Amino acid sequence: MSEAEASSGMAHNAGPDEKTLQVLRDMANRLRIRSIKATNSSTTSYLIPCSNAEIMSVLFFYTMRYKQEDPENPDNDRCILSKGLPFVNVATGWPGQGLGAACGMAYTGKYFDQASYRVFCLLGDEESTEGSVWEAFAFASYYNLDNLMAIFDVNRIGHSSSMSVEHCIAIYQKRCEAFGWNTYVVDGRDVKTLCHVFSQAAQVRGKPTAVVAKTFKARGMPNVEDAESWYGRPMPKERADAIVKLIESQIQTNKILVPSPPIEDSPQINIMNICMTSPPVYVADDKVSTQRACGLALAKLGHENDRVIVLGSDTKNCNFSDIFKKEHPERFIQCCIAEQNMVNVALGCSTRDRTIVFAYSFAAFFTRAFDQIRLGAISQININLIGCHCGVSTGDDNPYHMALEDLAMFRAIPNCVVFYPSDAVSTEHAVYLAANTKEMCFIRTSQAETAIIYTTQETFQIGQAKVVRHSDNDKVIVIGAGVTLHEALVAAAELSKEDISIRVIDLFTIKPLDIATIISNAKATGGRIITVEDHYPEGGIGGAVCAAVSMEPNIVVHNLAVMDVPRSGRCNEALDFSGISSRHIIVAVKCILMT
């Protein structure tokens, strides 16, 4: 045992009596029975709860404080498992994601809510091979999350074979302690010890707690317990019925335990309907990158509501999130270069509507966290992700930093709103709209400094495009966003000198797409559309527009996109090299008019 055992005072002063311990054992066996019946009714058999039944019994009916009738109560203790259930706010899916979300919940409880609720996360031993687990371990230790407990269910069996370290509990203990966690080693079947350790952990200050519990897969099931051959296999009904009867014979009481009520000390908050109390302050002659405008907008938003928080991955000096940090230092969370954990922490912070979360990093690096992002959508979590350094317009940076796949990635996420602002004014509106949107949002920003297109009085809506240049003589529509919109406007000005008029549309949101505006303007210009995007052709603006007009006769779409791996260079050189500069737009317009 660790130093925590020397602490005096326990959450349950005298510990549980023998009657309570027996009830906890009986409840664990009822969990086993329900697990067997539930999994045996499907075509596979994942008897995971059989190994951790005692842990769950003690956790939910002795240690945790919550109101059963009010699972979303902000004062309830939190628990992270692998399903999105009333008491489990985050779907974690494939192993390795739950602890990061638990870190976000614990950080919110300790530093933002400053409340008494605690956070518990149950992990399988197989999860310990995931790097994201240790990203979370480092985060929790650095921020002294003493309201967080991670419980390892070490049953030694993985999906297809035993774990490499099997039941070498000391290895898990050393790893946890190396990250600065208060660590206990316990027999996961011993409810008395579990009660004692869980209570002692509540007294530890200044560091998170890890409980390494030795357990056995399919615990309590003769000829199945600790066997490697049963993972994922359906169990014959006769055997399952016999095992259920055996476990039922071990239950001595029908009593149940009622959890202790939570300590009601979470603050009342309001994160709804945040208004832009003053318009953007840019003037027509300004040249501002959208990622700088995003940093300024976040800082401004932070003054509108004190529950706005920003998470960074050690890129604040590159993407201007340091502006927010300077003005609201207590609400900026440095997650370091650990993007998977940053997204998981963001998911945890946003649960139960306790904060308005923005996670800001290079858009290219969000590819590392795609699994976390897609599971955030499954959990229906409201987080806002901001990607900077998008496209070849990043220029002098190398291709590794140039996000050219991000639109495809976020367009594939269900119910995700994808913003692509083209100037500082529209960027500020995108930030405020995202803050008020109860779905996942992605804001795509660029490094290139661009002109101000819109007046400070312009209004924006999700799914509403802007026709920024038009005339009655327009022959072609050019659709762009971000830097390519500016290239389209340059091309339009040059073409006008040759008496060629084109219409220019700014999409603003790529998802949802303003299909009505696209189709109506296409019909008014002879059904000719050119899309221009600082993105690979797959999954970007061109694909979205093609899908939108696919059922419309007599509309033709030509797509200009980055067709190959880019090179470093000045912004204008990179755009021209990739075939998406104003020069290439002019050529495309003339070609389409000749056909």
From Swiss-Prot:
As one GO molecular function, the record gives:
transketolase activity
Q: Which Gene3D superfamilies match?
A: 3.40.50.920, 3.40.50.970
Q: Catalytic residues per the record?
A: 339
> Quick one: which residues bind substrate?
389, 397
Keyword Metal-binding recorded: yes
Which positions bind Mg(2+)? 125, 155, 157
List, alphabetically, the SUPFAM superfamilies matched.
Answer: Thiamin diphosphate-binding fold (THDP-binding), TK C-terminal domain-like
Keywords of this entry: Calcium, Cytoplasm, Magnesium, Metal-binding, Thiamine pyrophosphate, Transferase
On cofactor binding, the record's note says: Binds 1 Mg(2+) ion per subunit. Can also utilize other divalent metal cations, such as Ca(2+), Mn(2+) and Co(2+).
Location of this chain's protein in the cell: Cytoplasm
Q: Where expressed (tissues)?
A: Not expressed in the embryonic neocortex.
Q: Known EC number(s)?
A: 2.2.1.1
- The residues the record assigns to binding thiamine diphosphate are 93-95, 155, 217, 339, 365, 401
Which InterPro entries does the entry mention? THDP-binding, Transketo_C/PFOR_II, Transketolase-like, Transketolase-like_Pyr-bd, Transketolase_C, Transketolase_N
Its needed co-factors are:
Mg(2+); Ca(2+); Mn(2+); Co(2+)
* Quaternary state and interactors: Homodimer.
Q: What does this protein do?
A: Catalyzes the transfer of a two-carbon ketol group from a ketose donor to an aldose acceptor, via a covalent intermediate with the cofactor thiamine pyrophosphate.
Please report which protein family the annotation says this sequence is part of: Belongs to the transketolase family.
Name used for this protein in its record: Transketolase-like protein 1
Give the species this sequence originates from: Mus musculus (Mouse)
